[in-house]
């Protein structure tokens, strides 16, 4: 049996890429998706995935903690990065009203822009949600008909909220 890992932070300097990647392959992990959390990390994720196209793919996006960095230039860079064959999703994106490293308004703006981009490109989303269920589900519901799908990678809710995400086919 082989395994896939859908959210590895190989762009984190604390995680030594080569030995971890080699151990993963030895442990029958056949495919890994590297998570992009801002423009720099998204560029790094794409670069790594291009080096190992049979084993690595990338997500590109802006994590809610970095939403204060999101603007027109960010959106343009994400659109350009999306041209890479290694890009399989938009994210890690979403809302985090627990830590609030970016304001809720900044997070809502960045999240909605990334949802629009995912819809335009026909890509799924890689989602993060912490203590922001209502606002996140409202935006997801707004775009769900044109959104290709996605996965809720981080969420702090209860079973009822989990079922609501499942009702959205996420």
Label every PLM stretch briefly.
Residues 1-170:
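Mid-domain alpha/beta scaffold segments of enzyme catalytic cores
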